[in-house]
Design a protein with these regions (language model features):
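Soluble non-cytosolic domains of exported or imported proteins
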Residues: 35, 54, 70, 141-145
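A short beta-strand-turn-helix
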Residues: 32-50, 80
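Sec-dependent signal peptide cleavage junction
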Residues: 21-32, 160
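Detector for the c-type heme attachment site
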Residues: 64-68
Length: 160
């Protein structure tokens, strides 16, 4: 009987102390905020950042893989959030108008302008350097390692 009381007496302080243990909240997971064209392009011009355009379609399996594998990488997210304004662009969406400065474009017109008339397939990543008003494109799926190198090259290009 005394062993039960002794055990209870030892257990009570342990339970009380564990109740006051500070919560260990994990660090918040970094998130990538995607913009629509009109908001994102204007923001990039205003802030002097690089526009990163992810051209995709709803039926594109490689686009979905890139969303799932590449754009969820914490290092990629951090780099994009710091140096770029990311924009999702689906040229197959209808009844939308995209603005660049004082001009308006239909989705297929913007796509033709981005590709310079040479369709590249999906996904394609476009880097628009707003300070120089120049454009680079990189067609196809990119894993985190190769995409990180692309981001570094775009950042270096923007500083020239």
């Amino acid at each position: 009987m005394t062993k039960k009381y002794a055990l209870a007496i030892l257990a009570i302080p342990i339970l009380i102390l564990s109740a006051f243990k500070p919560a260990q909240n994990p660090a918040p997971k970094p998130e990538l905020k995607w913009y629509g064209w009109n908001e994102g392009y204007a923001k990039a011009v205003k802030e002097g950042k690089i526009v990163l355009v992810d051209a995709y379609t709803d039926w594109c399996g490689w686009c979905k893989k890139m969303d799932r594998d590449t754009y969820t990488n914490p290092n990629i997210i951090k780099k994009i959030n710091e140096h770029f304004i990311p924009i999702k662009f689906n040229p197959e969406i209808k009844d939308v108008t995209y603005n660049i400065d004082d001009k308006s474009f239909k989705p297929e017109e913007l796509y033709q302008m981005l590709t310079n008339g040479n369709a590249t397939g999906f996904p394609t990543t476009y880097f628009i350097f707003t300070k120089k008003m120049s454009l680079q494109l990189e067609p196809g799926y990119k894993d985190s390692v190769s995409f990180n190198a692309l981001l570094d090259a775009a950042i270096a290009e923007s500083k020239k």
